[in-house]
Each structure stands twice: as structure tokens, then as C-alpha cells.
Amino acid sequence: MAPLITNIYTADPSAHVFNGKLYIYPSHDRETDIQFNDNGDQYDMADYHVFSLDSLDPPSEVTDHGVVLKVEDIPWVSKQLWAPDAATKDGKYYLYFPARDKEGIFRIGVAVSDKPEGPFTPDPEPIKGSYSIDPAVFVDDDGSAYMYFGGLWGGQLQCYQKGNNIFDAEWSGPKEPSGSGAKALGPRVAKLTDDMRQFAEEVREIVILAPETGEPLAADDHDRRFFEAAWMHKYNGKYYFSYSTGDTHYLVYAVGDSPYGPFTYGGRILEPVLGWTTHHSIVEFQGRWWLFHHDCELSKGVDHLRSVKVKEIWYDKDGKIVTEKPE
């Protein structure tokens, strides 16, 4: 499978269909002298590009709309514009992004445009009560919008075990709960306000259940527990929450009846690829379902120089996601 974008290195693709066209909102990888570490310091991204195309089969020419937002534009940000997402409401387009503030703590910001391709104007402060990384915004059928977020280790989610807005620096770095009886840390969700720029409620923790027991996944279940890269989509009235398992490099999903969960683990979507991280999105476009992800094939394995790829996915008669077309 060839990379979809080759003019620059891109990762963490959030794909959306706006006005009949497919738009991709990735992070922008760049060369750096920072050494690889489990905190993710080598992912030193400084701006965002937006891409668009008219078809996927065959792929049409990809348009790079250029830099739409950069670190220098955002008063509260110090560095690391990591995986973004986008949403639309009432003719406005919103770009959601994580970044480190001046104290080195990850927050989530929002920037606004009149066009899906930007450029985007950032709000001067991060979303109040936001923390960690990997925002993914899902707009339900009734127009309600929800933000899913969180990431372990360098994403700092494990630093908030004492509660929302209580940052425990002792948990900084590549750490997470472990050991007998420890439950996996869940991703976070909050409904957004009508203007799409703040949380409308207290942030909640999502519970992902093991199908064989109905109990929350254990912290030591690294093949299934949440690590980062939240995404939500809906199919046949069910909510599909997908995510990366991080250090085991799987893309997996869980299914529930509410945007708040709980979600029951459903299986793997993608096996490990070349490169440390897996981050994705799932979107319906022109009547077919597509999985966007990234790997390091184009850079010949350089971990922080990734490239967006896309593959088709399907659902079987039971609603399970499959990567080969059912008979």
C-alpha cells in the first residue's frame, strides 16, 4: 500500500467528509536531532497542513492546502503540535489540537475557520479543563458533539489519576498502573458546548469491558487496553470506539450503545506496522468505509517520519469490523 501523501511526512490522520470532499487533518512530522525516547520528545511537530481529495478508488490527486496553523500563532503553546482533529457546525470549521503549554503540560486547543481547508485562527487559551492529548470530536445524529481524548506515557493521562485538573508530576514519563487487580486507565470524554469551543460538562472516564468477563480491562492487558489515539464512529446505531494499544502496536475497537460507553472490546483492526505508533481514523466516503493510518515505510523506518496510508474496511453480519470483504 503506497503512502497517500508524499510531499511531506504526515501522521495521525483524522479524515472527514465535508461538502462531498474528503479532508485529512494530520500532524506534520519533521526532521529533528532529538533522540528517540518513550516520552515522545522526538515528535517535535510545529505546524499543521490540511489535505483534500475527491476520490479514493482510485485515489485522486491530493491537494496540500499548506500551513493552516503553527506554534507561533498560539499564545499558550510552547511546542509539540500533536495529533489533531476537525469538526463542523453552522458553517464554521473547528480544528482541535493538543500541545504543551508554557509549563510543559499538554492541553487541548481549538482554532476556527470559515473553510474546511483553513487557515485556522486559534482561541487564545486552551479549552478549560482539558488535558492530555489526541482529541477526537464526534458529532452524533442529534447534533451533540463529544470530545474523546487521552494518551499514556508522554501524553500524560496517567498523571490525572487523582482527578480532573489534578496533575501529579510523580507519574510523568513512561508510566502507567500495573500489577494484579489494577484496572486500565480509560480514555476521557466530554460533551462540547453549542459553540464547539468548551466542555459543557465534567470530563468523564470511559470504561472498556472485556467480553469474556464483562469486567473492565486490566492494566496489564497491554494487547487490549487503551493507550492513545481515540476515535469514534457510528454504524447501524452502535458506537464504535477505536484506539491504539501503544506499546503493543495494535489498532483495536470496542462497541457500545451510548457515546459515553461502556464499550465492550471487539477485536483488532490493524496489526503492528513499521514504526512505533499507530494512530488512525475511520470514515464513510462515497458509500464505502475507510481506515486511515500511518507507518514509516517512506522514511525507511525512521520512527518520527511517518506517512499517511488508507485501506478499505468492512463489517460482517454481526457488525464486527473486518479487513477483507465478507463473502
Curated annotation (Swiss-Prot):
Enzyme active site: D12 (proton acceptor), E228 (proton donor)
GO cellular component, one term: extracellular region
EC number(s) stated in the UniProt entry for this protein: 3.2.1.37, 3.2.1.55
Entry's localization field: Secreted
Record keywords: Carbohydrate metabolism, Glycosidase, Hydrolase, Polysaccharide degradation, Secreted
GO BP field: polysaccharide catabolic process
Reaction(s) the record says it catalyses: Hydrolysis of (1->4)-beta-D-xylans, to remove successive D-xylose residues from the non-reducing termini; Hydrolysis of terminal non-reducing alpha-L-arabinofuranoside residues in alpha-L-arabinosides
Annotated SUPFAM superfamilies: Arabinanase/levansucrase/invertase (SSF75005)
Homology family: Belongs to the glycosyl hydrolase 43 family.
Protein known as: Xylosidase/arabinosidase 43A
Organism, as annotated: Humicola insolens
Gene name, Swiss-Prot/TrEMBL: XylL43A
